[in-house]
Curated annotation (Swiss-Prot):
Gene3D superfamilies: Winged helix-like DNA-binding domain superfamily/Winged helix DNA-binding domain. This is UPF0502 protein HEAR1280. InterPro entries: DUF480 (IPR007432), WH-like_DNA-bd_sf (IPR036388), WH_DNA-bd_sf (IPR036390). Signal peptide: none annotated. Residues 1-21 are annotated as: Disordered. PANTHER family: UPF0502 PROTEIN YCEH. Residues 1-13 have a biased composition (Polar residues). Belongs to the UPF0502 family.
């Protein structure tokens, strides 16, 4: 697996056509875990190689779930240290080196923006509501509007760190995704696939509602026929 951090040297027009990857998915996972654990378990932060590897392979709050080895994580750490996204910390009396992220300094992020970005890095595509529900221990957002303000800040960075995806038919909220791995979400690809999936779901719901209405109408007709039959019988009693 290639863990090398990549930087863009393309022109602005090239960046608009396709986002340039800063990391691969494994490097992004390492950074996201450091950002997450800093907030969730400050007493165990900075993190050792073993703890960081376990965090990368965690089964909960991760999409996708990964299976990374310590050698792979160690190699990623060395690349990220060279690029100054991570710092190695040698604490007095500690037997092992520990590591901390430097995302705030690199991208001038306050904790609310870092929390939003961390959720997208760990969980993939999310709505603003989902980000708010899942970031409580990273940052307590008072409203979805506060989340959207953080998302807008990340989208306004150059190059942008986050993208807003097209709102699919039948959905109320836009969805957002990280651009750190050079993902591209054109309407003809991911956006269209999601829209088609959602549209299919809406179509199925409409069909179910139609069938339920037809069944209800048939029941009424049967009840009316039963009443007429009862009246007919009463004429001969």
């Amino acid at each position: 697996m290639n863990t090398e951090v990549m930087h863009s040297t393309s022109t602005e027009s090239d960046a608009q056509e396709k986002p340039q990857a800063m990391f691969d998915t494994s490097a992004m996972r390492v950074l996201a875990v450091l950002a997450e654990k800093e907030a969730l378990t400050p007493d165990s932060y900075p993190m050792s190689l073993n703890a960081l590897t376990n965090g990368c392979n965690q089964l909960t709050s991760r999409d996708p779930v990964m299976a990374m080895g310590e050698d792979e994580v160690r190699e990623i750490l060395q690349h990220l240290i060279q690029e100054k996204f991570i710092a190695e910390v040698n604490q007095a009396g500690a037997r092992v080196s520990k590591y901390e992220h430097r995302l705030r300094m690199k991208w001038s992020l306050e904790q609310d923006k870092l929390a939003v970005l961390t959720i997208l890095m760990l969980r993939g595509i999310q709505t603003a509501g989902e980000i708010r529900n899942r970031s409580g221990r990273l940052h307590e957002f008072a409203s979805i509007a506060d989340v959207e303000a953080g998302l807008q800040f990340l989208m306004d960075k150059y190059p942008p760190l986050v993208v807003r995806l097209p709102r699919a038919p039948g959905t109320k909220e836009a969805r957002y995704a990280s651009l750190l791995c050079g993902e591209s979400y054109p309407e003809t690809a991911e956006g269209a696939a999601y829209a088609a999936s959602a549209a299919a779901g809406v179509s199925r719901q409409d069909r179910i509602a139609q069938l339920e209405g037809e069944v209800g109408a048939l029941r009424e007709e049967v009840a009316a026929l039963a009443a007429q039959l009862q009246q007919f019988r009463q004429q001969f009693e």
